[in-house]
Amino acid sequence: MSELLRNIDGRTKLAGTNKLEILMFTLGLDNRTGRCETFGINVFKVREVMRVPPITHAPEMPGSVEGMVSLRGVLVPVIDLAKYTGVQTDIKPGIMVVTEYNGHTQGFLVEAVDTILRLDWSAMRVPPDMLNAQMGGLVTAVTELPDGRLVMMMDVEKVLAETGHFNDDLALKAVKPLGISDRTVFFADDSAVARKQIVSALEAMQVNHLSAINGRKAWDELQRIANYAESAGLPVSDMVQVILTDVEMPEMDGYMLTRMIKEDKRFANIPVLMHSSLSSESNQQLGKAVGVDEYVPKFEPQKLSQTLARLLTKNRKD
């Protein structure tokens, strides 16, 4: 298992190349379907993989939260992904995948880990509507392996939001209206939970917004906007004042999207704000390397609104 994740820190050099590496895992044979589905998680978010340690159970926790474990003196919540996804299996999870999102550490119980797969984000597709409905919006991207198996990228942000890790209701109440009616933010994110949080923050600010569900669709839409502005003799910055992007997205990731935006002179005066749960300093530095202007962690709507307010008013023409 240590061999599987060896040099995981060095894998961050893939950022900006539209490539990623995913740790594949299974949740056990589902007695209802007779299938053992394969899921994936970006190795950027994996801290370690271990045998399941002793778990301290606590009352009044969501059904899929097994309890807490102590890792080097830090209490970490543990989520049983089979229970969360509704997989009915007789197999007891034997592996815990320790992950970090937005500075929060949690353990995910799985049946087994398979291998680490390197691929291009262009090989990751938006899940078909049927699969999306079947999985309750839990899958953000899918890819097919040479042996015909389907690997599904799990929307971990949705898991964490629904198991009580992120609750932004109170923070949203502190978001103030911008007081300017002619500002527009364009954002790209593949997570339905993240998109909902962004929209809530922007609506609280009373800011106009446009969006796309992945980097490729975002780039296509931004090109359409830029072409329209060019034909009308207007700067693109008259139509969009800030571009907000996630990092992990099927077809094109946020690093590649940012690089392409920065290489197109029509977007020269429009800041790119990276909005991601990849919270390590190394990932922030990688964003800066491709031209990201600012970084805001996900699920912190007050920080998001404050940063957007500053960027939206910075170069405003009165």
Question: Model-found features: residue ranges?
Answer:
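An acidic, low-aromatic, low-complexity terminal/linker signal
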Residues: M1-Q241, V247-M256, E263-A268, S277-A289, ...
